[in-house]
Amino acid sequence: MTIHFYTFSNVRGGSSRQRAFRISEELERRGFSTIIHTPPVVDIARTPWPKKFRLIIQILRTLPSIKKDDIVFLQRAIYSKYFFVIMVLYLSLTRRRMIFDIDDPLYLHSFTKTKVFTQMATAVITCSHGEMEWAKKYNAQVSCIHIALTMSDYEKFSNPHEQKNTPVTIGWIGTGPEHIENLKVLAGIFARLARTHGEAFRFVLIGALGDSRVYDIFNTIANLEVSFIDTLDWANPESAPREIQKFDIGVLPHQTDGEWNKAKTSFKILEYMACAVPTIVSSFGEMPYIITDGENGFIAENEDDWVEKLERLIADDALRARIGRAGQERVREAYSFDATIPQYIKVIES
């Protein structure tokens, strides 16, 4: 049996890297045969004609390699109508087993394609409980398996909590231009903190990508010391944890309104926690399943809550160490590949 992955993007895309390429590697280590087919679906969608025709032919040529007992694994593969039609026809004619993986509430903007793949799937894997509840309307075989990470890549960059940093470093990492509205959540919080604790903390934002909108959110806040790192080598598994290790506090501001946010989750929260960095998150989506407030992290319900919990962490070295270590243990037990790959294997073998 071989598992045939068709992915949203190449390995440089975070979703496909963690939900397909890394899964493939981990399954191979455990004796499974896997293959990742190219081109990625998003390349088909974005490539103009007549070059698009060549990519479609490439996909068609992969289909004869899928044998009777093999499994087709579609990772977020809804972004090309041509790929969608090809795969629907192929699966309908051959009755091959198919696993459909979604890590965002894709049904909110691509309802029909997401619904059809969900209905056709032998099994569906979602990344949040909100997505799982939606998928269960159309398929009984649904598992919630959260995006995971390789724990060893992060543990060696654990924040040691051995010395007091002055000022305390509050950090955020991500693709800044994609999170403008989420980052704006921090603006009012930092403005209040900077008025009373301006010399006690600094802010580091990784992933600004040279976008002036990201810079402007924070450069206008009086008394706020802020540093921007435009980009990292995201394909290098050590680049992010090496920088996160320097954070004393990790923050994940996020909008909370709307169906999209109710079903969302985050990878960066796991990266903070895996490096033993105490974390504060907005109350959205999957966060209450990951964090127990006050035990392995903090969940902030509103701006006042953010300010109060940041003040506590800024002032208390021992609290930062305790929360950071508890968060790291939480990721090790539930959100590392050692924890999630057995769940994938159970789906594959069922």
Model-derived segments and their meaning:
Residues 250-252, 271-274, 278-281:
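Short hydrophobic beta-strand element within catalytic cores of glycosyltransferases
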Residues 207, 215-245, 249:
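Nucleotide-activated donor-binding/catalytic signature segment of Leloir-type glycosyltransferases, i.e.
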Residues 262-263, 283-294, 298-299:
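Short acidic/histidine- and often glycine-rich active-site loop of Leloir-type glycosyltransferases
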Residues 108, 149-167, 181, 350:
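Acidic anion/phosphate-binding donor-loop and adjacent secondary structure
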Residues 312, 319-334, 343-346:
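A short, well-ordered alpha-helix in the C-terminal region of glycosyltransferases
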Residues 4-5, 162-191, 203-204:
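Conserved donor-binding/catalytic core segment of Leloir-type glycosyltransferases
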Residues 108-110, 114-142, 151-156:
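A short, active-site helix/loop in glycosyltransferases that binds the activated sugar's phosphate group
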Residues 293-304, 312-318:
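Conserved acidic donor-binding segment of nucleotide-sugar-dependent glycosyltransferases
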